[in-house]
Amino acid sequence: MVDVNRFKSMQITLASPSKVRSWSYGEVKKPETINYRTLKPEREGLFDEVIFGPTKDWECACGKYKRIRYRGIVCDRCGVEVTRTKVRRERMGHIELKAPVSHIWYFKGIPSRMGLTLDMSPRALEEVIYFAAYVVIDPKDTPLEHKSIMTEREYRERLREYGYGSFVAKMGAEAIQDLLKQVDLEKEIAELKEELKTATGQKRVKAIRRLDVLDAFYKSGNKPEWMILNILPVIPPDLRPMLQLDGGRFASSDLNDLYRRVINRNNRLARLLELNAPGIIVQNEKRMLQEAVDALIDNGRRGRPITGPGSRPLKSLSHMLKGKQGRFRQNLLGKRVDFSGRSVIAVGPTLKMYQCGVPREMAIELFKPFVMREIVARDIVQNVKAAKRLVERGDERIWDILEEVIKEHPVLLNRAPTLHRLGIQAFEPVLIDGKALRLHPLVCEAYNADFDGDQMAIHVPLSEEAQAEARILMLAAEHILNPKDGKPVVTPSQDMVLGNYYLTMEEAGREGEGMVFKDRDEAVMAYRNGYVHLHSRVGIATDSLNKPWTEEQRHKVLLTTVGKILFNDIMPEGLPYLQEPNNANLTEGVPAKYFLPLGGAIKEAISNLELNPPFKKKNLGNIIAEIFKRFRTTETSALLDRMKNLGYHHSTLAGLTVGIADIPVVDDKAEIIEESHKRVEQITKQFRRGMITDDERYNAVTAEWRAAREKLEKRLIANQDPKNPIVMMMDSGARGNISNFSQLAGMRGLMAAPNGRIMELPILSNFREGLSVLEMFFSTHGARKGMTDTALKTADSGYLTRRLVDVAQDVIIREDDCGTDRGLLIRSIAEGKEMIESLEERLNGRYTKKTVKHPETGAVIIGPNELITEDKAREIVNAGVEEVTIRSVFTCNTRHGVCRHCYGINLATGDAVEVGEAVGTIAAQSIGEPGTQLTMRTFHTGGVASNTDITQGLPRVQEIFEARNPKGEAVITEVKGQVTAIEEDASTRTKKVFVKGETGEGEYVVPFTARMRVEVGGQVARGAALTEGSIQPKRLLAVRDVLSVETYLLGEVQKVYRSQGVEIGDKHIEVMVRQMIRKVRVMDPGDTDLLMGTLMDINDFTDANKDVLIAGGVPATGRPVLMGITKASLETNSFLSAASFQETTRVLTDAAIRGKKDHLLGLKENVIIGKIIPAGTGMARYRNLEPHAVNEEEYLNPPVEEEGNEETTEVVVDTAVETVEETVE
């Protein structure tokens, strides 16, 4: 076998007959499989040991030679080679076909490759191949046309007319084979190139397609006649096994049935030919042989599929590769692994952030080999067998050994569905009793896990390298930030939030108010002994608290609460004291009003202060983000654990409970509803009198009930008691929101009907009062719709993620700086008055392209090619700069990836991205993972003024990434200039917009009901939208440049996600959009050897042009093509990646004809062949490093060179570096 990590590329071509013979170990002549009595394979049958190898290791069929010492000997009695059984998985056989047979992939595929090669229609081909018509192979001197088709009857008539032997016409695959042999590729290609110079329309399209196929044959060295099979390979028997079932019956792979049909028909045909049977019988047998081979290769592609028992279609070779259950997706891209287990998860509140609880019986099973090795090493038993017995008996001594073995041996926990990389994290195992895995409560958000019966899988990394990577790169404590937006993904939730909220509350007039303490311990002691309440405002000496005080703040008394003293106790030392829950306090320190000179009038000072709100979930998130920014991961994860413990402790002490009496009652609810009823009556009256339309009435009624619900909501909020447990849960962000609260205490409001339209009858009751039967019935509609929507959304979102991953999986950070001279000019993204994404957010973590200066003073804020930090971004925006040119993925020149400077920081770590980071996959996950949060629906804009549906949510994202024509498309102008007139034409119900510019005039017809974005006298740019709606990106590409289209797509995706409150970094969307515009269509080949009309990678196109320009020729011209992500994935340079994505047979057919070479640059290709992926630590530049020991002395005191040798030293160092670079490449 070839070592997978050795080879550089993989090529696929058509197999010539000689190639098939060279693979084969012998001919399969009989359809028999296994002898039913002896259960031994039959000779010359489909499982023959002589051809395929022995069924038992190191043993021939007759048993003359047994044991390994006879390896390689071929038995003189039975002819079987003594070797491993494993060869039955790799040795192939063959069947010599008695008549040539066409390969269905090349004849039936779309477009038909055989048809294009011969310039015949697939219909005509089918008639010839299946013996329904003759084709003229050589007309000789007759007036018949070469390749013309004739029926049996016509053939007889022509024979009578011109005489026997006056021309050659044949039927069947044999005829096609003769025609294919006659094709002169060079001559045909030259003729087609000539034809293309003048051809137009349909002729031109056909010529381009033919040229493409013929050129593929010519360049790859494949011969067209190899599309016809004279010899059929038989795959190894262990890949189509026969298994004996309990009842003595056999279960066999469908392929055996299909092969059996071929062999039977082939043998019958041979016998008929020997007997010189009548032509019609032979013809029929040949047709049946052709059909049998078709079914074997791709059953059901032509006509009705061959079925097995129970009329189930048999699975052919093509089906073995296709689809989710095919070879690619089932066995190559994802495999089941050893050393893994799964169990239900339970919460582990006492664990540290980097730990997980593993049940003892699970751990002993997972770490069995490690424990056994240790048992033998300690001489408890003598050999491994005995050690295994010891473990299986559950001996007492194994538990201590297990404890030691798992120490510092991380395990991976994974929860399905793994939507992003945080779905697999590493933990240090802690042995526990019970049978459930214990999970740290803070990592639940990343996994999207809860403890209502979720299960998780556990995996053990075995090798030292795998353990090191798990520990350094995947440890849960390292994953503080979410890769999609760089915000903390581990924020306290539920009880933890509630505890910290309760802890930091302030109340006026509670016991012990105004007491002053010398330090924290005294305050805690007073609290424990009941002298002071947790929420009482007290004083504490600032000097006793280890915080970064200013000079004025020292030697003072700080006014705070006991709870806040405890809360600040867990914070890192360098952080300011947190007194107010806002960012100013977090970054600049406590405001001056909370400080009092020693011995000042404290009670008076306290009474002058307003009560502060407690710390809510959002504030805790900001604190964590700030701490991460200042102290990085280790300190942050330690703080998170302290915050978790504090939160759980105090939510327990607070003892918050919920009773029905905690739901407040709004006194004037009846009046509010009565008022609305009256208004609705008035609206209905107006409608009855014909003053308003039905649509207007509907909108007015629903608006009225919405207003009523909002009024109730406002009353509720105004009257709420801050110490009400439900209000505390809601306000802190622990659970529930204002809408839930208003359904409990206000009114449920309007509901959606099953068709998605909002019903006019609102639900007036709330849950405290209880719903009437009719109201209950109405509310079930909404609930049901919610459930179905979620189910559909999950599937759609998952498929979107799969397509995104596929198109971007080969985008890896490949170099430090690509040295591009272009940049991207960015400003904030806004929709009308609404800000979608601010400039500050867009700048953070990117590199500048040009110097940014202060618009007023002209002072340099930041130079070119410098990283814009959060603070720099704020400084740029505060200076009043509105647009900045940055380095962007769009303008990066790196081949097969991106460079570090164009990408910026890695959002998951907050540091500059490393070479080797698989940014394409991360981008795909970041866009796909929040997909389930997006809505499914297409909104009707409501009201009368529009007749267009605006697509939003998930369908809109799919529309953008698939580059489809959008629903509700906007009309765009191709002229830059001024709108001179807008004319309405009532007869055709359209409007005409006239635009006059320097380059010419444009006249655009828009629907009568479309809402205009321009008015007469307004200026418009090229590609600007004249009406409301979405622009079709392909049209925009025709009038503007690539960068404008990329920028438009980026903005559109951001609008969808941000409108749903999902934040995604620009760079992720940039990576995806760049993959959609990677191809160029050749318009004129110039002096290059490119073909007109072909799609090619933009890099290959520029390379071809470079070579021609250097030689002084005319370069080719091309037009950039925008493709949807599905098409872009299938057009990738890697055929393995494309075939494992979709349309497997089409991709492989095409790749084989072209003799495509897969250079294994992406991740999928390498996973498929089992090679280590070329990203992260698997990248060549990291794999080829040779570690060597350094003498400590030299390391600490490097030897000083003498002055004379300086130059030579430098040169030596340079060449050394260069050679290293070369080997790394």
From Swiss-Prot:
Q: Which domain of life is it from?
A: Bacteria
The entry marks the following residues as binding Zn(2+) 1, namely 60, 62, 75, 78
Cofactor binding remark: Binds 1 Mg(2+) ion per subunit.
Instruction: Report the EC code(s) recorded for this entry.
Output: 2.7.7.6
Q: Which GO terms describe its biological process?
A: DNA-templated transcription
Cofactor dependence: Mg(2+); Zn(2+)
One GO term in the molecular function aspect is: DNA-directed RNA polymerase activity
Q: Where does Mg(2+) bind?
A: 450, 452, 454
Q: Which UniProt keywords apply?
A: DNA-directed RNA polymerase, Magnesium, Metal-binding, Nucleotidyltransferase, Transcription, Transferase, Zinc
Which SUPFAM superfamilies does the record cross-reference, listed alphabetically? beta and beta-prime subunits of DNA dependent RNA-polymerase
Q: Which NCBIfam families match?
A: rpoC_TIGR
Name listed for the protein in its UniProt record: DNA-directed RNA polymerase subunit beta'
